[in-house]
Curated annotation (Swiss-Prot):
SMART domains: Elp3. This is GTP 3',8-cyclase. The keyword S-adenosyl-L-methionine applies. Gene3D superfamilies: Aldolase class I.
């Protein structure tokens, strides 16, 4: 079936394997690896350049999703260990002006719990690339309270929002999140669409025996709202007993369920470094109803060869991969008086060490020590 063929791994951009051989010989680790025009970039030894920065603004969350954290929650970082607003904005300035970052996504925990979020977004929106352009600013949120703040966030400079929603069944939502807050999330989706933050993206993690039955209802709901639904294969980032490689719901299984209701065809727009394979969906029973659905097959069809992300945690460390077990701390160097150039050098060195892939299928794979709520999506 064509949908299965489309999910085969895409070849890395610019033939990464070949590029890594030629690039590694010419790029030196002891500089920030500037191209000829003098602009610096975050490049790794395989030639991938990071343009997309994920910034975790807090490790705190107001939900207790079963696949993310225990019912009692986790021990939050003390405030003095987390970056303050000025420190966040200084590192973002370095990222944009010195290191070539062009997209910034604020995550958590739950970023709406961060005090002064609007001020942080406004400060980020004031940054300009060396081409004089504003960086693209996005937010990943569980949606609780977003409806009341969406106008202020957009005015501050927010361009787009991703809202996490794994089910539209009220009872299942309570079971999954351990909170009765579904109506608030749905109100926030309506508010984000009304605010024109197009496309509003809805992220749904599919878990075996939990919410497989929600695949089609979620798709119908998101299409009716004009939002872009993205199904995500569950990854080994929560409680270790929650994930087994052989039990997970794969991208192909998700597509098979969708095909019971929709006619699917691959979207024509280039995928680039985006994690989702996009599908145009037409309702079989009513062809007037159309929309777009994304599938993020991080486990079965990883996109590591095209990854363009760097990650900054709320306590000021750089992670070059979501699944990395090593981190490069910037906070202490920043507080000890390091210059922007010195901080940029540390950052560049961290990204240079990025591995070719996440290694989930490797025999010796170990989950990262940090839970997903402390890394950021």
């Amino acid at each position: 079936m064509t949908t299965r063929l489309y999910l085969s791994p895409t070849p890395p951009r610019n033939d990464r394997e070949g590029a890594s051989k030629s690039t590694s010989a010419s790029i030196k680790h002891d500089a920030y690896l500037p191209p000829a025009d003098g602009n610096r970039v975050l490049v790794d030894r395989f030639g991938r350049i990071a343009r997309d920065l994920r910034v975790s603004l807090t490790d705190r969350c107001n939900l207790r999703c079963t696949y993310c954290m225990p019912a009692e929650g986790l021990e939050w970082l003390p405030t003095e260990q987390t970056l303050n607003d000025a420190e966040v904005l200084r590192l973002l300035h370095i990222a944009v002006v010195k290191l070539g970052i062009r997209q910034i996504r604020f995550t958590g925990g739950e970023p709406l719990l961060r005090k002064n979020l609007e001020d942080i977004i406004a400060g980020t929106a004031a940054l300009r690339t060396d081409e004089g352009e504003k960086v693209h600013i996005a937010l990943t949120t569980n949606g609780l309270g977003l409806d009341k703040r969406i106008a202020g966030l957009k005015e501050a400079g927010l361009d787009r929002v991703n809202i996490s929603l794994d089910t539209i069944d009220a009872e299942r939502y309570v079971s999954l999140t351990r909170r009765d807050r579904l109506s608030g999330v749905l109100a926030s989706i309506d508010a984000a669409v009304a605010a024109g933050l197009h496309p509003v993206k809805i992220n749904a993690v599919v878990m075996p025996g939990v919410n497989e039955v929600d695949i089609v209802p979620l798709a119908e709901y998101c299409i009716s709202k004009g939002a872009q639904l993205r199904f995500i294969e569950q990854m080994p980032l929560g409680p270790r007993e929650q994930w087994k490689r052989g039990d997970m719901v794969t991208a192909e299984e998700i597509l098979a369920r969708l095909e019971e209701k929709f006619t699917l065809s691959p979207a024509k727009e280039p995928r680039g470094a985006a994690p989702a394979a996009l599908w145009n969906a037409v309702d079989k029973s009513n062809p007037v109803i159309t929309g777009q659905i994304g599938i993020i097959a991080s486990v079965t069809h990883p996109f590591c060869g095209d990854c363009d992300r760097s990650r900054l945690t709320t306590d000021g460390t750089i992670r070059n991969c979501l699944f990395s077990r090593t981190e490069t701390p910037l906070r202490d160097a920043l507080r000890d008086g390091a210059s922007d150039d010195e901080l940029a050098q540390l950052w560049a060195g961290a990204m240079w060490e990025k591995k070719p892939g996440h290694g989930i299928d490797d025999e010796g794979f170990l989950q990262p020590d940090r839970p997903m709520s402390a890394i950021g999506g």
